[in-house]
Amino acid sequence: MEETGLVPVIQIDSAEDAVPLAKALLAGGVDIAEVTFRTEAAEESIQRITSECPKMTVFAGTVLTLEQAKKALHAGAKAIVSPGYDDQIVDWCMKKNATVIPGVSTASEVQHAVKKGLSVLKFFPAEACGGIKFLNAIRGPFAKVRFMPTGGISEENFTAYAKLKNVIAVSGSWLCTKENIGLKEWDKITEACKKSQREFPRS
C-alpha cells in the first residue's frame, strides 16, 4: 500500500466490470483497490479480481457488519476497511489474523485503536473532519500511527495529503468514478492513474 500510495475506492454495480476495471488500474500503475460493499456485486467482484488478476491487491471497503467482513475475506479480500470503528469487526479480524483498517475521526477513536494494537487507520471523512490540520495535530501524541485519509480527497488535493509523514496512502474515487465504470471508460481510468502516479510526491 505504501509503495503505490494510491488506493482507489471503487463501487461496482455489475461484477462483469470487475476484471476490466482491475486491468485498467494495473495498466495505470495502481495495484491495489478498495471494492466497497455498497452494491450487491461487491462479493463477486472481489472473487473475480482475486482469481483473474493476481497482481491486484483487493481491500473490501464500507464493511459495516461482521457478516460482510466474513464474506469479504472468503471472497479473497486482503484487508477489511470500514468507515467507522466497530469493536466486533476489529476483534474478529484480529483473531483471524486478518488485516483490518477501521475508520476514525477523533483522538479518542485513534487512542482506542492503538490500545487494540492497530497502527494503520482510515481517516474518514477526512476533509469534513479537519483534513490536513487534524493529521498534523494528531501526529504529536500518536507518532507511530499511519493514516489512509478518505472522504473529500480529490485530484486537486491528494498530493498535499500524500506529503504528510503520517499518511501511508491516500484513498478516493477520483481515479475511477462511478460514471467511468458505468460507461466502461477503461482508458480514462488508466490515464487518471498514470497522471496521479506522476504527480504523487515520492520521498
Spans of features found by a protein language model:
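Catalytic beta/alpha-barrel core
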Residues: 9-11, 31-39, 56-64, 69, ...
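Glycine-rich, proline-tolerant flexible connector loops at the mouths of alpha/beta enzymes
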Residues: 26, 30-53, 174-184
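Glycine-rich phosphate-binding active-site loops on the catalytic face of alpha/beta enzymes
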Residues: 83-89, 122-132, 166-188
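Glycine-enriched alpha-helix->loop->beta-strand junction motifs that scaffold or abut catalytic
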Residues: 26-31, 52-56, 73-80, 94-101, ...
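Catalytic cores of alpha/beta
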Residues: 21, 65-75, 108-116, 153-169
